[in-house]
Amino acid sequence: MFGGPPECPERPDCLPGLRRTYGLRFRAFAALDAGGPLTRQALEAGDIGAALLFTTDPAIRAGHLVELTDNRDLQPAENVIPVLRRATATRYGAGLFAALDAVSARLSTAALTALNAQVQMNGRDPHAVAGSWLRDQGLGRGTS
């Protein structure tokens, strides 16, 4: 059984794409969430056998899930990018852009996975994790 977001049976990069690109067919589909906690829990419990997760999900690195290689580029790259309201950009201007650029330059997939693990697997407060990371990177006061 494959688990994924409710729109997966119609999305070209989900079930139809897996069938067309890799010849994969699943007996059933479970509508869950978009690679979030419901999907992860269903995989870990054995309720589903396959799903799409984000590469920054720490459960993949925990050793009990197998990450498959998408050597035919079915899945698009989904990079983390800052998005601002125009009013926010106008209010804070170049200083905010410079700060966001500095964070983006240091926030690799490996770093984001490690940060996610601290929150999702170790139960740490997201603000504290982000603040520590910012301080460790020499970026400002480390407050979030």
Where are the predicted features?
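A post-motif C-terminal structural segment
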Residues: 54, 74-80
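Bilobed "Venus flytrap"/periplasmic-binding protein-like clamshell domains
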Residues: 1-36, 40, 124-128
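Ligand-binding "clamshell"
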Residues: 45-50, 59-73
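Short coil/turn segments
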Residues: 4-11, 86-89, 105
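Ligand-binding clefts/hinges and TM-proximal coupling segments of bilobed small-molecule sensing domains
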Residues: 10-13, 94-141
